Amino acid sequence: MKEILKNLVETTTLPEDSYLDQDAEILEIFVEEIEEIFVELNPLLIDWFANPNDPEILTTIRRHFHTLKGSGRMVGAKSAGELAWAVEDSLNRVISGAIPLDMTVQRYTQTVFKIYQYKLYPIFKTVQTTDIDLRPLVLLGQHIQQNRILAPELEQLLELSTTLNAENQITGF
């Protein structure tokens, strides 16, 4: 992680994960739930970029991140749950009118989806420890929720919305 990004996130904390201590069957159910969400969320995100003002699409996307949050917390994937919460809360604020829906919100949502798809899901599926530092993405979400101007280092994370397309791709996390 770049030094300047490390400095930005030094005060951002995430709960400690405990999913490796979870019963294998419960983890398997969690992985299956993620797979189901992927099937629904992938085309929804495409539709949302084409129709950003469709409230039904927005609400459904928010609900999927709500599910990722709750399920992640339940199985002990707490940092991933917090990341999903950052998206859910951002979308809640869009729905309530507290922040505008713009490309930053959409790209952030897409970025987190791809982090789940290409980085977190393979870890959960193979029951591995994660060394991915999700704090920059959570901090990015917090800045979006507060409608703050993004530091260039945080804004650069949004590039993952279009560039992250494979598990083995290096992201800097």
Regions found by a protein language model. Name each.
Residues M1-F173:
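Non-catalytic helical tethers at domain boundaries
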